[in-house]
């Protein structure tokens, strides 16, 4: 018989490790296993090895609510974040529950047994593995680890230099003294450009359109002062609350006063780079937070541009040549190395196949329940963080909600929990998975994602304060979550 666990957590990255820590703290008698397809924990922070890899938000909010970030830098480099995750896993004894080289391919739900059968492959020997569980908690991330987005780059096969994608950075790439073109304008490109500019002959960031940027120090003076005066846990709690409040206020201002926010953001860039560069390369056509803002720690990209070691070109590619790229303006960029920072390939939960009682699940046909579960899919939750704040702020909330749910089911003697549309919900209009967020990587996958409705709880909210109250305090018997015991309906 397949091995059984109360909970199977898929993914040992930032979300999965956090989920296991919460489960162990709040549901200590539940058996669980973490299935991880890679050879190590860390997810994004183990996968990405490109120069300068770092967080794009502060670690007092990207860190777990239960584990203080106790370093001088609040904008942290990738290795420091990976070390933090390892510490969290070891301190909470969840590392012993991880099974590496177990790539989950799908899962099948049986209402008769009230169990998921999880289908995985052992990536070392290729052997199929089956496990069963009562609850499936998906924390496998939101993008494909195997296939990044393949942007159309005409004639790239003609290029005789080196082409690198940030998702698969070679350890032995020597770019010292080389001419580098980084294609892209997102967080990855803006991280790589100043990092490579320190050694390369010159780095050009080639973008089709500009992105909003904001510079801030990589050290939080208030946080570091509090750490000198107070215990780490208290100092962290105060700093975290401060930063969450400021993030919420800033996001609210950008949405309610977009023109004013736009002028403030562009004004800050003008002070660093002047009008000509700002107007040509840092003035987006959309409003702030229609797409995610890019963070520049200590204004590192500004410094690289001012020094002449880096530059920005806003144009479209006509074709690659053996020695570079010809643009629509007829300009040509010569390059020894091209970095294609053109984006991630988003996927529905973990690129996996699911079925409920033999019927395949098409997530595009479902409605999202509070942004964490799916209509008519029992005993499953999936983590997707905030697009306007640190990912972990939401993954912590979702993990705590799942623990609440599991304890509620234990207390009521139920073993199945399924979000189902009420009669009054059946004519709801379908709205996109996330409202008002327009980057290409999101738009490319939106048609395959669950829909929002026009009323709670069929929403995917992006506001931490309101969602914290809902997920941690709102009644679970909300008329949507249907709790049953196998072969017997229970009214809760």
Go through each PLM region and give its residues.
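Alpha/beta-hydrolase fold catalytic core
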Residues: 263, 267, 271-334
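C-terminal active-site-capping segments
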Residues: 396, 400-492
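Short FAD-binding loop at a beta-strand-to-alpha-helix junction that anchors the flavin cofactor
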Residues: 62-64, 162-163, 371-388
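Rossmann-like dinucleotide-binding core of oxidoreductases
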Residues: 2-4, 8-9, 14, 19, ...
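Short beta-strand to alpha-helix junction loop
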Residues: 69-87, 99, 183, 253-261, ...
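Feature captures the FAD/FMN-dependent oxidoreductase FAD-binding
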Residues: 72-144, 272, 319
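Core beta-strand elements of the Rossmann-like FAD/NAD(P) dinucleotide-binding domain
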Residues: 3-5, 124-135, 175-176, 328-337
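Beta1-alpha1 glycine-rich phosphate/pyrophosphate-binding loop at the start
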Residues: 5, 9-10, 14-98, 207-208, ...
